[in-house]
């Protein structure tokens, strides 16, 4: 998920699914750390996590096209486009008042410095506190 090492400047970035039905905008700082999670769903989908506070996420269109999938604890709300099947964002259990946006689904301007770090999602409960300090400034929840 994403942490902010120290950048002040905020940028508005567009994102969405492959077919274009789901579109959103996010506001992010100039420096971000994105996590590559090793849990089963992230590993199989190639998801790169960027946690964005709900106040910095704006769904422009496609909400009616989203299909929700929950597993294990049932807390995380995985949202897939019902047309193309892409998960461009979802509501993570670590930050239920935020969104995890897939870096691969965002148009990132050249001014953004992106660092990708590994996260041991196979042992999520043991490592979840390492996700604290995201763009939301919140701590993780179960």
What are these regions (language model features)?
Residues 1-16, 21-142:
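A short Gly-Trp-Pro
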């Amino acid at each position: 998920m994403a942490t902010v090492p120290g950048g002040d400047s905020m940028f508005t970035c567009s994102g969405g699914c492959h077919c274009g039905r789901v579109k959103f905008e996010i506001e992010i700082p100039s420096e971000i750390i994105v996590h590559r999670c090793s849990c089963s769903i992230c590993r199989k989908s190639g998801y790169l996590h960027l946690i964005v506070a709900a106040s910095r996420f704006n769904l422009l269109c496609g909400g009616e096209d989203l299909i929700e999938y929950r597993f294990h604890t049932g807390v995380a709300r995985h949202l897939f486009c019902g047309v193309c099947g892409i998960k461009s964002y979802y509501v993570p259990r670590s930050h239920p008042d935020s969104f995890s946006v897939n870096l691969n689904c965002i148009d990132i301007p050249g001014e953004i410095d992106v660092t990708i770090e590994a996260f041991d999602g196979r042992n999520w409960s043991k490592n979840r506190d390492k996700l604290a300090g995201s763009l939301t400034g919140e701590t993780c929840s179960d």
